Each structure stands twice: as structure tokens, then as C-alpha cells.
Amino acid sequence: MNIVCDKVLLSAAIDGVSKAVTMRSAIPVLEGILLKAEGFQLNLTGYDLEMGIVTTIEANVKEAGEVVLNAKLLSSMISRMPAGQVSILSAENGKTTIQSGVVQFEIQSMPANDFPELPNTGAEETLTIKTGVLKDMIDRTLYAVSQDEKKPAHTGELFEILPDKLTVVALDGYRLAIVERPVTAVKDIRIIVPSKTMTEVAHLLPNDDEEPVHISANRRYVVFMAGGYTIMSRLIEGEFLNYRNVIPADSRTRVTIDTKDFISTIERASLIITERLKNPLRISFTEGRVVVRCQTNLGRVVDEFNADCEGDEVEIGFNNRYLLDALRNARTEKVRMEISGPLSPVKVLPAEGNDFLYLVLPVRFKND
């Protein structure tokens, strides 16, 4: 293989596909990127046997061919090359020469035949959605994905696709995040996408919010195509919780709150909460105000701010981090909290509209 290409394009492509590369593996080829030159382009592939990322850049292909190079080493070298054109020459003796200007590296390559072939997913296009919409849905829900490997179905995000609606759901047993958006889909399907895949999809989506993202899916695989990248991933098997059954049907207390005021108050109260001292926040919702209290061995705090409260007065215990996560991901000037009782899941919604629905599970006080 013998090619010449632009350093900036090559560096960006390497960084993109490296998200699917295993950094430490007993199989060295899985730590590499497959480079394949043909026609007028260079194809780059990273694949960790669960997720594969492929992209293409323009190149002056003097000799077609393919080779596997260590991803970490290749990324470090290219990023430190001078600006301009980079040449890559792979010889039959297993050595690859990479040169830009007066800088020249010679590194050991790996045979392309050893690189695992990406599966033929057989996934058919299911829906097309704007980049900005999909990124917003991912960003608003990913925080609630479970880290508990004992419940693998909840370590991913549920994609519930209907002909006219896409619902993305994440939960971890303590909180729930739901975002729905109107779409036009070809078929109904319910899949669980690994959180790692969703993280990398969000990172690789183009900056143009209007650019389309093509999503193809079946029962085993999902494929995202956008911004010159194709991201293929295996799906998580298992049953996702019937999340609709845990959403309270009614509420006895409704509170409309300035989001920034609430975040600032919780952040101040959190100063006396540590990993070792995890006492819950004690939050009272009364007519016209919200009072936040907390006491640990470091000290105690009382803070309050004005709010529009309707219905029964109530005092609830919250994990400070879980409540902060919901408020920070709301991204609205005001939120509405709907409360059924001191031990029932609390709804967090936008003050107007239905952009999202978050649930936060209260914490029982020790003296209850």
C-alpha cells in the first residue's frame, strides 16, 4: 500500500475510528486500525468485536492495499506530524513507513487478513432523524444508564421505535430518563443499545444539527450513519423494565421551580456531603418556598428559595447527585416537579411542554 493524504483529515479519521479499538487486548490486531486504500480513498476501520466504526477520507492512492497499524501509536505519530501531506508506505516485510516533511517513522504493521471482518448485520433502514434531535435525546438520557453489570439490559439505552415516534429510555434503579420525539419510521422495533455505543455516536455526530442520521436495526444489530461515519454495534439482549408501570399516575403536590436556583441551592448543600458521609438532602415543599436541609459529621446547612407550590405540603429525602443530574440535564429555565408522596418516585418535567420526563427515587430517612 502506498498513499498520500492530508494530515488533518487523517488525524480526525484515526481519532474517530479509535473509539471502537480495544486499547489492551490479548489479540494484538484488535488494538489496531485497518487501513484499506483503493480508488481515490482510504478506508479506516476500528472494531472491538462489539462495536465497529468505519470512515473514509480522500487520498492519492499510488498503490492499493491494506494493512493494520497500532491505533494508539498511529494516532500519536500523526498528531505530532507537521501540517501538510502524509505518506504511508507499507512493505511486504511487515514494515510501514510514515512520512511528513522531514519526519519519518518506520513501524511494525500487522497483516490485514488477521483483522476480524465486520459482520453483515442485515439491518434494514428503520428511520432517519436530524443530528440535533438525536444528539439532544442521547445527551438528556445517558446520565441515567445503569453501571450494574448484573442487570445488563439496563446498561444500555432502550430505543422504542414506532411509525410516528422515537422514545429513548435509560434507568438505573434510582432514576429514570425518558425523551420522546416525533419521527417517521419504516417499522416498529424495540432494541437496547449499549451505552458505550451511544456515547460514541454522540461524539461522532456532525456539528450541523440539520444533517440526517440514518438508523438501521434488527434484533441483533444497530447501524448509525452520519457525518461520514458508519457505527455498527451489537445490541444488548434481555428484557428492559416496563418503565411505564413505574411512572406515578397522579400527584398530590406540584412545584414549579427556577432550575438555576434549585441547582445552586443543592450545590451549596452538597458541600458537606462526601463519599463517606452520604446523608440525604431533606427538602420541604411548602406554600411559596422550598427549604433544603442537610446534616453530616462535617456540619449542617439550611437554605431556601421561592417557588410556586400547589397541593399538599411534603418533605422528601433525595440523593443530592441524582437530583442534580436530573436538573442539569433538564436544560430549561423552569422545571415542574410532581410528587405523589414522600416515598413515591418524583417526576421532573419541563414547566411547559413535554421535552422530557425524569423520575428520581426518594431516599427514606433513617428515623422514618
Question: Where are the regions that the model predicts?
Answer:
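Structural preference for solvent-exposed beta-strand-turn elements
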Residues: M1-D368
